Curated annotation (Swiss-Prot):
Biological process according to GO: D-amino acid catabolic process
Signal peptide from the UniProt entry: none
Recorded GO MF terms: D-tyrosyl-tRNA(Tyr) deacylase activity; Gly-tRNA(Ala) deacylase activity; Ser(Gly)-tRNA(Ala) hydrolase activity; tRNA binding
Primary location recorded for the protein, binned into one broad class: cytoplasm
Designated name of the protein: D-aminoacyl-tRNA deacylase
HAMAP family cross-referenced by the UniProt entry: Deacylase_Dtd (MF_00518)
The species this protein was found in: Streptococcus dysgalactiae subsp. equisimilis (Streptococcus equisimilis)
Pfam families: Tyr_Deacylase
This protein's GO CC annotations: cytoplasm
Stated family: Belongs to the DTD family.
PANTHER family cross-referenced by the UniProt entry: D-AMINOACYL-TRNA DEACYLASE 1 (PTHR10472:SF5), D-TYROSYL-TRNA TYR DEACYLASE (PTHR10472)
The protein's Enzyme Commission number: 3.1.1.96
Subunit structure of this chain's protein: Homodimer.
Length: 147
């Protein structure tokens, strides 16, 4: 899995002008699924996301997790995180999982996150518009194959 975590004051995702999901303080996740992702990748990503201390404490130090601040997650599927830009000027996305597998994996990922924090989400495969107010900004890239 490849994920981009953005600490936000608020975020929303819309489809055809209608809001599909929205949160206040928390994390916007852009989620890419690879063809060889397995249960271990899912468990690792969920554990990291819910426990990562990237929210400020009373002293202004990044010392609190999303659970500590009682924040929410807005999860948006994004196969383009697997873009291969080595050849030419048009990215190839052959490194991403096939849609059927990726959709099921994305659903399980969100279900497991929801065991810890409230999760809003976009619609897998839809053309979405994402709005956010970054907080910091704090942006973290997480690749489950690099641990």
């Amino acid at each position: 899995m490849k994920l981009v975590l953005q600490r936000v004051k608020e975020a929303s995702v819309s489809i055809d002008g209608k809001i599909a999901g929205a949160i206040n303080q928390g994390l916007l996740l852009l989620v890419g699924v690879g063809p060889d992702d397995a249960a271990e990748d899912l468990a690792y990503a969920v554990r990291k996301i819910v426990n990562m201390r990237i929210f400020s404490d009373a002293d202004g130090k990044m010392n609190q997790s999303i659970q500590d601040i009682k924040g929410s997650i807005l999860s948006v599927s994004q196969f383009t995180l697997y873009a291969d830009t080595k050849k030419g000027n048009r990215p190839a996305f052959t490194g991403a999982a096939k849609p059927d597998m990726a959709s099921q994996f994305y659903d399980r990922f969100n279900e497991q996150l929801a065991d810890f924090v409230p999760v809003e989400r976009g619609v897998f495969g839809a053309d979405m518009q994402v709005s956010l107010i970054n907080d910091g900004p704090v942006t973290i890239i997480l690749d489950t194959k690099c641990h």
